[in-house]
Amino acid sequence: MVLAALIREEIPIPDGVDVTIDGGVTVKGPKWELSRKFNHSEISMAVEDDKVVLEVKFPKKKDKAMIGTVRAHISNMITGVTEGFRYRMKIVYAHFPMSVKVAGDKVVIENFLGERHPRTARFVGDTKVQVKGDEVEITGINKEHVGQTMANIEQATKIKGRDPRVFQDGIYLVSKE
């Protein structure tokens, strides 16, 4: 079996974005900045000619998987500081009119399936949530924080003990932008 002596991944850096590597990766965009530590000693990172270069010499199976993961994280950071991430969710109810509002760092869901106690879902990081009519819009620069906030809202409206084919009430993901 022949092993690769070197795996090299390159991530292009768009204009207006500055990437620095010292112990971690810091990505500065026109408006925002993100930083993250990657504690994978086998992966060497450098910035060369408007590209982030990731290399692993004599990679093992875990190193091959990890270099792809690190590449995806860095490209998500670049996308986050340039464009940001926006997830849209739809409030669906058939039996009881549900009201959703933002209170501090959490979303409060009232009258879900006629329950008297409100359900709550926390924001993660510096994610922003807006409720407009029957739509919930989640925006932020960190894809993981936006996705986890969306998952928290969706889990807060999970129905237990009832047939989900009949009781389709909840807040569901409609689009990712």
UniProtKB/Swiss-Prot annotation:
The keyword Ribosomal protein applies. One of its GO terms (biological process) is cytoplasmic translation. InterPro entries: Ribosomal_uL6-like, Ribosomal_uL6-like_a/b-dom_sf, Ribosomal_uL6_a/b-dom, Ribosomal_uL6_arc, Ribosomal_uL6_CS2. One of its GO terms (cellular component) is cytosolic large ribosomal subunit. The keyword rRNA-binding applies. PROSITE patterns: RIBOSOMAL_L6_2. Keywords: Ribonucleoprotein, Ribosomal protein, RNA-binding, rRNA-binding. GO terms for molecular function: rRNA binding; structural constituent of ribosome. This protein binds to the 23S rRNA, and is important in its secondary structure. It is located near the subunit interface in the base of the L7/L12 stalk, and near the tRNA binding site of the peptidyltransferase center. NCBIfam families: PRK05518.1, uL6_arch. Belongs to the universal ribosomal protein uL6 family. Part of the 50S ribosomal subunit. This is Large ribosomal subunit protein uL6. It comes from Methanothermobacter thermautotrophicus (strain ATCC 29096 / DSM 1053 / JCM 10044 / NBRC 100330 / Delta H).
